[in-house]
């Protein structure tokens, strides 16, 4: 009986419950999709998802961030003004820092997958307890890389 106990499935179920309790659609849907893939023949796609999922997610996120520029909601004038306002210049600097941290986070999560569970637990807890949003794992991993020197 113990040989058939799947700890990874239990972790996904716990994440699903946390997502539901915290009303976090992203965590809920992600856990749901991964559970379905795991318990069906679709599990043959896990190597592809592991190899390309993070990059695909970053691509979709980038499209979402750039959409206001493409749609015209963020005007060219507003973009140009961002280079002369102190507040906007600070925002640009922080954006650069966060992007750099995210890059470090991707590298750390790829090279040291043992930290992923802790980062996910912290992110889900932050969403559930602090009403945060689930953009934390990459930035958290980037910050962690500064502390552990990777």
Swiss-Prot record:
Main location: membrane
GO CC field: plasma membrane
InterPro entries: UPF0756_TM
Record localization: Cell membrane
A Pfam family this chain is assigned to: DUF441
Keyword Membrane: yes
Ranges that cross the membrane: 1-21, 45-65, 83-103, 115-135
Keywords associated with the record: Cell membrane, Membrane, Transmembrane, Transmembrane helix
Membrane topology: Multi-pass membrane protein
Family matches, as PANTHER family: UPF0756 MEMBRANE PROTEIN YEAL (PTHR38452:SF1)
Homology family: Belongs to the UPF0756 family.
UniProt cross-references to HAMAP family, sorted A to Z: UPF0756 (MF_01874)
Protein name per UniProt: UPF0756 membrane protein ABAYE1440
